[in-house]
Amino acid sequence: MTTTRSLVIEKELPHPLEKVWRALTQGPLIKEWLMDNDFQPVVGHKFNFRSTPMPNWNGVIDSEVLIVEPNKKLSYSWSSLGLQSVVVWTLVATSGGTLVRMEQSGFQPDQTREYQGANYGWQKFFEGLQRVTAGLT
């Protein structure tokens, strides 16, 4: 049996849960902090994240919405370059705002480079999520 790895990032954002949820589930807002997309918060919806193509990568991440629990949990598949993973966002209201937990699971033992790249990328994306959420009214 192959054991997979998960990447987990947790940060408390000083914003109400509803604002964070909007930034996670509205396509134009997702584009501002993550990538261009055709996301819709509907279970079963197949969509793509699109970024600038690079050598050996067409810039497309194939995804499907798996879970939508408004203001609580969002999950979608994340398939690109041989990585078949699942991203789960969990939101919990705190006295200071919202605890945001992102887990990307499914990294195979030989996907160390992909794991490290995802860790770097999600740190940057969280910065963008914070910025976009701060700008919401």
Please tell me what each predicted stretch does.
Residues T2, S105-T137:
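A conserved amphipathic terminal alpha-helix motif
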Residues M1-D38:
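Hydrophobic ligand-binding cavity/cleft-lining segments
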